[in-house]
Amino acid sequence: MNMKTKLFSTALLLGFCMNAIAQDNIMDVVPNAKEIKYNKMIFGHFIEHFDNQVYGGLYDPTSKFADEDGFRTDVIEALRQIQVPIVRWPGGCFVSTYHWIYGVGKERTPVYDKSWQVEDPNTFGTDEFIKWCRKVGCEPFICTNAGTGTPEEMSDWVEYCNLNIGKFGRMRIANGYPKPHNVKYWSVGNENWGAHELGARTVQEWGPLVRESAKLMRSVTKDAKLFAAATSNKNWTMPLLREAGYQLDYVSIHGYWDPLFHYNNPASFIECMMKTDAPEKDILRTIAILEEAGFGNGKIKIAYDEWNMRNWHHPWHGDFRKGFELEARRKNDIPSTYTMADALFSACFLNACLRHSDIVDIACFSPIVNTRGAIFVHPEGILKRTTYYVFDMYVNLLEDYMVPTTLQTVPLKHADKQTGVLDGILTSNENNTKYAYVVINKDPTEKQTLKLDFQGLNLKSTKKVKATVLSGKTADDYNEIGAEERVVPKEMTLSVKEGCVTLPPHSLTVLFFEK
C-alpha cells in the first residue's frame, strides 16, 4: 500500500502557548491530505575511490578489524545499525576515467587515477563492492563511466553483473561468482555537465549519449533502474529529458552548499543554518523541469545521489596544470569540523526530501566513511560523527508514512539572510496509531516553544511526551577520537503545557505519540 487517504479534524488551534510572543511556532495537520509511504532509499549513501574512503576506510586487509575479505567489520556493524539501504559507487569524479574490467579477476591492474591524480591498485573492484553490499545488507548502485567510457563499455558492465551467458557473464563465472549479481540500479555518468569533470559533455552531446547508453544497458537488463547526470538547471536537464527521458527512471542531482574545494574554511553554525532552505528550492526547481518536460507525477523521479552540506576539500584552484595539493585532503578528517551544524543541516535536507517523497525517491549522503562522511575510520576503531546519529534517528525512529503538515515558525536571522527557526515533519504508521514528529531547532542558543496539533491528529492533549533528542552543550560540539561522545541521541520525557513543548537550542528532536 503506497498511498492512503485519512480525514483529519479541521478544527483550528485557538489557544496559544504560555508566555507566547506575537508570533508562535505552530504545527498543523493538513486536513483531508493524502499520506505517502516514502522510500527508505532516501537514507542511502555514497562511496568513492577518493583519498581514504575505500582503501583504509571500508576496505583494509591489514586492519585488526578486517574480515576474511578485507572489509572492516566495525564499519559494517555501524552501517547495519543505521540500516543503510543503498550505496552508490565507484564515483564521483573517479568514475569518469574508471574502466571496470581492470578491477575484476585474479590479476588486477593498478591504474593511474587521472581524476584524483593518484594510483589506484584496483584490488577493490566490482565483485568486492557487491560482496561488501551484501554483508552490509544494502543494494549496490553502480555509476558508469560516461566521461572516457563508451555506451558499449557501460552495457558490458551490466552484462558482467547480471548475465550468465555471453563473454562478460562467463567472465564473472570464471572469476568465481557463478550466480548473477543482479544489480538493479545504474547511472549513466557523473556530473558530466561540469568543466571540472574529465570527459565533460556539452548540452548537445549529453542527451544522445544517455539515450544510446540506456538503450544498450536495457538490452541486457530490461527492468534496470536507470539514472542520468542532471541538475536543477533547465538549460541542461530539459534537453536531456527531450532526448532520453523515455529511457530514464531518475534524474541524478548533486548538492553541496558549503564550497570548500580550495580553502578549508568551514561555514559557522549560523551561516550553515541560513543554507538549510536551499535543498528544497533545488528540489522544487527540478520538479518544475520534470513537469514541463512531461515527466511529472513520478514518471521520472529525483535521486539526490550525492549530497552533503560541506564539499570535499581537494585544492586544485581550477587549473589542472597545477595539479592537486594531495596532503591538503587530510583536512577533511579534522573532527572539530563536524558539529551540530552538520547534523541539523542534514536533518533539514532529509526533511525536504521526505516532504517531496512522491518525487524524491533516493538520496545518497556523500560519502559514507572518511572525508566528510558520517563515520571516520582510524586504525583503532571508528568515530561516529554528528551526522551518523541523524541517520540513526531517522531510520530507526520514524514511522513509514508522511503526514502532510504546515509549520508556522518565527524567523531566524543572520546578516541579510533569514530562515525559519524550526523545521518539522510528521510520520505515522499505516493505521495511524503511532506518530513520530521530527522537529529541528536551528537557533544556536535559544529554546523554542512549539504548539502541537493534537486535535488534527485526533489525539487527546497530554502533559508529557516521550522524545529522543540530539544536541550538544553548544552548537559547535562534536565527537572526537578517544573521548566520550558529546553528541549522541538521548531519550527523555518532555513536559507539555497548553499543548506546547519546549525544544532545546541547536537540536534535533523526535516526539512520539500513540493512540
Give names to the regions the model predicted.
Residues 14-16, 316, 451:
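Alpha-helical transmembrane segments and their juxtamembrane interfaces
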Residues 1-24:
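Bacterial Sec-dependent N-terminal signal peptides
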Residues 247-250, 269-274:
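Active-site cores of enzymes that catalyze phosphoryl transfer or operate on phosphate-rich substrates
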